[in-house]
Amino acid sequence: MKNVTKGLFMVIIGMAVMTSCSKYKKYDNNEVIENTFTGNVAVSSTGSDPGGDFTGNGDSGTYSFAWENSKTKAELNFDITSPTGSVQFILNDRKGTEVLNQTISGGSGVDSYSGVSSGGKPGTWKVTMILTDFNGDGSYSISPID
């Protein structure tokens, strides 16, 4: 009986550890987690390959959403047309580990980014856009890759 109790205890502990490993699991795919951006973010593509457009008129704030990534990496593409301000994308894997952090500043001569995140844990990821004094428009797309 002692071994059965010990085994049951280990199973319960294992299940608790496994379910606590997904920091963003409580959110549905493409569900908005935070939106303090005073401009506009329009999500035009959802599912496993989210994408959309954003506009601002000197606006600032954060826009983040949950994204179901079945792979270990993500490909991010985004571009801006803006003389001022900046756009920063941060990707966190299901455990909350930052796997990509990229910023483009308006008027810097660099207006687009295309790259791959470092490896992370598959599951529900968090996609964060931080827009600062953003005056213009832009678009983004994200795809899961191995």
Q: What are the language-model segments listed below?
A:
Residues N69-L76, P122:
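Extended extracellular/luminal ectodomain segments enriched in beta-structured repeat modules
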Residues T84-N101, Y140-I145:
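Short, surface-exposed beta-strand/strand-loop-strand elements in extracellular ectodomains
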Residues K25-E68, Q102:
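Transition segment at domain starts
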Residues M1-K23:
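Sec-dependent bacterial lipoprotein signal peptides
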Residues T128-D146:
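Edge beta-strands of jelly-roll/beta-sandwich modules across compartments, strongly enriched
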Residues K71, T81-S86, F134-N135:
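Short proline/glycine-enriched turn/loop motifs at strand-loop junctions of beta-rich domains
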Residues G109, K121-W125:
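A glycine-anchored, Pro-Gly-centered beta-turn/N-cap motif
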Residues F65, D111-S117:
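Exposed aromatic-hydrophobic patches
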